[in-house]
Amino acid sequence: MSEYNFTKIEKKWQDYWDKHKTYKVNEDPNIPKEKRIYILDMFPYPSANGLHVGHPEGYTATDILTRYKLLNGFNVLHPIGFDSFGLPAENYAIQTGEHPKKITEKNIKKFKEQIKALGFAYDWDREIRTHDENYYKWTQWIFLKLYKKGLAYTKEMPVWYCPDLGTVLSNEEVIQTPDGPRSERGFHKVKRKPLRQWILKITEYAERLIKDLEEIDWPESVKEMQKNWIGKSTGAEIEFSVKASKEKIKVFTTRPDTIFGVTYLVLAPEHSIVDKITKDEFKPMIVEYRERETLKSDLERTSLEKDKTGVFTGAYAINPITGEEIPIWIGSYILGTYGTGAVMSVPAHDARDFEFAKKYNLPIKQVVSQTGNNEILTQPFTENGISINTPEEFNNLKTDEIKERVIKWLTENKKGQKKVNYKLRDWIFSRQRYWGEPIPIILDDDLNEIPLEEDELPLRLPEIENYKPSGTGESPLSRIQDWVNIKRNGKTYKRETNTMPQWAGSCWYYIRYLDPNNDNEFASKEKINYWMPVDLYIGGAEHSVLHLLYARFWHKVLYDLGYVNTKEPFKKLINQGMITSFAYQDENGILIPNDEVEKKDNKFFSKKNNKELKQIVAKMSKSLKNIINPDDIIKEYGADSMRIYEMFMGPLTDSKPWNTQGLIGIFRFLNKIWTIKNKELTKESASKEIISELHKTIKKVTEDIENLNFNTAISSLMIFINELLKHDKNYLEIFKPLTIILSPFAPHLGEELWEYMGETPSIFKSAKWPEYDPNLIIDNTREIVLQINGKIKDKIILNKGTNEEALKSIALKNHKIMQNIQNKQIIKIITVKDKLINIVTR
């Protein structure tokens, strides 16, 4: 009797798949559209840490569906690649002195080994790497399309700069501390510095990015996050004149009806008009305030928890309807990059304005009330209501009506207009870094931009030894004079030295998978028409906004230019839940690393002080030493065990904690299948009952895979395997279809069993998914309700016709029943055949 040697089996079939290119995909024109499917994983960033057990969860889900579709005769595109440009590799390179390209390619090698060890059905001939010049040539090509369409421009923008590190930092690399912002690396002081940046006009697509969400099958939570990020609001843009000046200040408001209650204006400290209108005696305070407040991040400036601060400019604005003079302040809670960078403040009807007015003793004028009467305000009234304390033509009106009247008056008097505003800001696209796509633009002496010609692409990233920060805030590329300075038609030009962000390569990678070796175009129209859109996209919810929004934006631009055939790139989106791990917390709530914890009598204690710890569920992290390495799991239990366990832990979209005991249970399950394989394989007919159970299992597994309910599909397989173990023989008519429906979950074992039965490998090429016969499904079970004194305590499944004595015995041994009848006297037990049992107690 042979043992289940998973190591040997898994290596054998992985080698076979590689050698025979089992999963290579072609665009067969004879396969109809309804029999083609594009299943996509969010491709990984190849970090130095390699995969942990959380990464393969989504990959396993798509792999099961891919194999299921192959067995159902589909042409399946299921590719993989690497998002290999970006900041982490560059930072790691700076720390270690190893070139980012070398680091990246070493990491990719490790990732590929780990991914292949899990037996995923990827077409490796379609592998892409965003740092490969044959890939980023087309990223640059798309950038030029954006530029020529007027969607890419340059502007000076404030960025974080660290003088000690000599580099620009991203928001994620800056920590806010009580002593001001600091660099995460080295904990140095940082400041804001204006730098010329490339920006993409994503705002031009704001409305379509909201509207077209209706056309795609995405989680409502993700749609809401995108809508909130875009932040559409309808209101009015109103123009306030500055007293004794030609300057005008535009504000946007969703409540134009409250214009009669405006008692001050607030400008962003960086607003361009501030220097022009500030009175001389107030300038020192303005300068000091600006220097202090602009050090803060946008998040900190706008936080509802933070105290609102401001400084008076000495200037006044004129209310366009009432003619009242109102003071103009600056306040850091207003951002220059949002809306007009100015707000009209109505403290009686806005919480933030109310707080500011109270702090600085500014007037509070009520112009809306619930009843239409003046009320004593202890807090702002922010709801709709009835207008009060307004000019007669606007008084005593409901909010919606006065809004329309105010907008009509402003429009007729050329003081404002109806406006739709978006919270979404244009995308700052450039980075002052080395490890990214060079931007294909050259500049003349006056900084006029000249795009490269398409035949000049790719503009290659030069391989340099010194990729460390320049010290000036410019990209390290700025130091390479023979690369930066170029001659053209007798004139000298400079190359753009900023690079693209990591998001650039991931904006369109799903298209390059269609035609990864095409040197003449980013993908042929024929292949785009053959596969697009992506039918199923699986990835983490952390990408709900940025990656998914940016990819949708680029796709819409490509659609407008006629390069793609769909308005949306991803038809259906699923976010897999996070796989967490156990962590340990002391009495003060401090998390203790796992290697400092010991277990005694099912309790957990600190090795340092022997104090008891609380076991909690937490995200896997290096600091907590609770990361599970898939290499270790595969070595001890096999890839098939790990795949099935990750799917069995719970619903795909739920977060769930890793528990190795559960994995051991799955390993035993696969060994049970091997035990059945070791029984005598017979062509004899199986009993009607076991055939019925097989068809029930086929039905359940089929429906569950279609609905991505992998955990319940596995559960039904387990139930059926336990039933088969009761039989002395291994029936071919049962084992063959069982092997097919098992194979998407455990492909290595599936291949081995398929070959064992004398079939031609690969199972995913030669087998056909079995169909269940409804006529053969005999339901011999019944749900029995367990009651105590007429109240339901539990429900159990028993065979149809279970006799009364057996039913009583089973009920009295039921855990929930036993809990509820302790110390009670049983008066009688009432049974209704195949329906219920009621235990009467007192």
Curated annotation (Swiss-Prot):
Gene Ontology annotations of biological process type: leucyl-tRNA aminoacylation
Cystines in this chain: none
KW Iron (keyword) present: no
Keywords carried by this UniProt record: Aminoacyl-tRNA synthetase, ATP-binding, Cytoplasm, Ligase, Nucleotide-binding, Protein biosynthesis
Enzyme Commission (EC) number: 6.1.1.4
GO cellular component, one term: cytosol
GO MF, one example: leucine-tRNA ligase activity
Lineage top rank: taxon: Bacteria
Alphabetized Pfam families for the sequence: Anticodon_1, tRNA-synt_1, tRNA-synt_1_2, tRNA-synt_1g
PROSITE patterns cross-referenced by the UniProt entry: AA_TRNA_LIGASE_I (PS00178)
Chief place of localization: cytoplasm
Binding residues for ATP: K622
Record's catalysed reaction(s): tRNA(Leu) + L-leucine + ATP = L-leucyl-tRNA(Leu) + AMP + diphosphate
Subcellular location(s) of the protein: Cytoplasm
Span(s) of short sequence motif 'HIGH' region: 44-55
Family (UniProt): Belongs to the class-I aminoacyl-tRNA synthetase family.
Protein name: Leucine--tRNA ligase
UniProt source species: Borrelia hermsii (strain HS1 / DAH)
Organism taxonomic ancestry: Bacteria, Pseudomonadati, Spirochaetota, Spirochaetia, Spirochaetales
Gene that specifies this protein: leuS
